């Protein structure tokens, strides 16, 4: 059985085959599955080779199509299809966010906790756009080396910032050439649930401090990751872990996310000068003709996608 070292602790670190890093591999595998669907919403040609390079057998088989849903138990097959659907609409949402931001004239993009994100290689960026990728050093190094080995080249000026988001990443970002006097498009995709309430607020403070009016930001709100729903969601995550264990993978999401009450990112953003818009997973699935996801196939509950534009910077933001 593949051991992932799931338990979180202060100052923990990971690679793409363990702990929080393994979730990036899981999501990339789902992007590969989603890309094979009829009328696919996403086309991430780098997802499968990156997952293969990480080498976690279950996700390699999933990404390559060797893990045929028809050969799985009914709950596993449906769960795999629905997870791929969820990641398709998520990827499509953040892809479009960046494309819309560049159409609005923004030429500076930041991907926080970039993991196996390949947007700097697969999206069509306008000339002069700089894309900054921020993640732990071993994650950045692995992806850069792997894609170079595949002969892939970025489609824009890609700059890597090898730093933990719990450290002084704004300084590292500026050293890489980030200009906080220019409008920026930021994404924190699949990130906030893996931060404590305090770390989430600090990250949002830092993003706001590094933004000028006209900057844009997109993320997700895990509406149900709170004390009220903790028991139910932990149960869903444990049952998902049992599905994984049937295939030799030890990954328990309940040991990776931070439960408990936290500020809703929409409330934070509105209180700090951002104008927000949001759409639920259910809304986005329906928009693309896909059925809703619920029960054990929604281990995080209802996910809300949020985009925001900074209208007026408040004086108390540091």
From Swiss-Prot:
Keyword terms of this UniProt record: Methyltransferase, S-adenosyl-L-methionine, Transferase
InterPro entries given in the database record: Ppm1/Ppm2/Tcmp, SAM-dependent_MTases_sf, SAM_mthyl_Trfase_ML2640-like
Gene3D superfamilies: Vaccinia Virus protein VP39
One of the record's GO molecular function terms: methyltransferase activity
Pfam families assigned to the protein according to its UniProt record, in alphabetical order: LCM
Annotated EC: 2.1.1.-
Coiled coil: none
Gene Ontology biological process terms from the UniProt entry: methylation
Function according to Swiss-Prot or TrEMBL: Exhibits S-adenosyl-L-methionine-dependent methyltransferase activity.
Family of this protein: Belongs to the UPF0677 family.
Protein's name in the database: Putative S-adenosyl-L-methionine-dependent methyltransferase Rv0731c
Protein's organism: Mycobacterium tuberculosis (strain ATCC 25618 / H37Rv)
